[in-house]
């Protein structure tokens, strides 16, 4: 039984210490997700015994990471000066994320081009743990040479509609590490709340971080009458960034502009189009798109420069600043004499060009701080900067990716048709209102697995501009971690394989077998995934409700 592979650390530590003995024959084939680029396993023979744990080389800094990963998977470790069981070597030819792994009855060898490659090798290792013929934990004889197909393998977390405490974000990061995701895109500002601490502008969180109420869960047309507020502290953000980095994950911050700006404008009304009739900004209490956009003024650009400076300090390792750029209504700019004057002053033909002007001004600020701009595919409207990276989300606009690639821009594929994990997962789901989704589009794990990120017809020389793919998890109807897990798993495992495994090795039937073998791990971690067989939540006792902040 695969459940034997999940060994509590307390049990493993009770075994008598007798290192280095080969295991009894291992009969189980590894069931890794994502599937490696090249894997050879010898089953039915003695493997490497984990009965007494693993000896790690004391002098190698990678041993600290190995110690953590083994411990988290119930495998005892000890640091030794010599006679270590694992040998770490560096091989630059494997690239930043590639690795080579070999397991014999006597030793484990890991070669990698970087720390990240070694982390992936260790995750492949713990996913290969099986019970030998005696029921003891062991590794089969293995030879793996592996590297990812795409460099961007991401999940997006929306903390604006509903925010999760840091402890829950850490659980998400742990699961991302296991399945070799390397990017957490953190959506921190929107119409319904500003969650990002900016010391120079405290009202962004004290005012912009609080809405008077939210739609009732299960009835989107009715307000619940309960205030919802909260934000992350600078220390909490640094803690998340550090925790993610230790797991090979880069956190990309998003600050929405010029639209989805209601919360910021409610906090500092002078940032909006104050010269329009009926100007009355507030933090929005309903979902959807709202009309408040930043005014294209020097005051706004100074504000955004200050915000970007603090964001760069909070996220020093992120090569990008995500500026949103999506769903920016032009109505207020059309009504605003000041916005119209800005168009005339800068020779802009329409409001779409005004948005491009706005984004280019912001991009100069971002670039001057050593970062790159990334935004949703609407940043293409009115003209796309040649150095911007574009996230393609509108599947009904199939030419947007092609046009960006033709211009030489990098793209990340996040099509709502395949990768909006807030969408319904299929016809089988709990009837309880708390399992309501934003729409009834049936987006199954099979649908996710069928995604080909490189747009059809992309010339071979342009394929490298497709950095990868990412699932977006908007949280209008996801108030806490149990609901987030139900929406994301097992679809995230399908995406992990899409983003990592060579296209020619993908096989849905084989993936389903390996998926079933991963479920005991998710059960052991208390993940409230959607059961593939009947759609029920894996943790039926989980409470789906808003946590107050």
Predicted regions and their residues:
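Bacterial N-terminal signal peptides
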Residues: 8-17
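Active-site neighborhood of glycoside hydrolase catalytic domains
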Residues: 266-270, 282-388, 394-403
